[in-house]
Amino acid sequence: MAVKKISKVQPERFEFDPKNKQTADRIIQNYPQGKQQSSVMALLYLAQKQNDNWIPLSAMKYIAKYLDMPYIKVYEVATFYSMYNLTPVGKYFFQVCTTTPCMLRGAYNLVEVCKKKISEEENMLSKDGKTSWLEVECLGCLLYTSDAADEITG
């Protein structure tokens, strides 16, 4: 599996829009006093949703300030979990598990299909900008790997 990539093109600023700011405040209120930093995952998801399904570095810095926590802690969470996208993704976004059990069931066939049909490298948008793909850790879909490859390749 490849190292999680950070987009080279980054917006300078990010802040929650008024609706998401209200949502963030409601989320934070669900945590006991002194434990509000535990809402970091929910706020990262909210930022990703607001920013076309990816999280720029400026959003991580904003969330760190919003939660009064070190930026590196937000960065660690965002880079650890595959549910957070750190590069722009297409409307159609494929995640392919390439851990050993899935590899044995044909996951690399799916990777080859993605390379041919979407883009040569993961984390890159297709030529039309609508589709992207990424290698990830286990998705819990081991039974479907070869079926998916057959369905995609015809």
Label each residue range with its predicted role.
Residues 2:
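Acidic, Mg2+-coordinating active-site segments of isoprenoid diphosphate-utilizing enzymes
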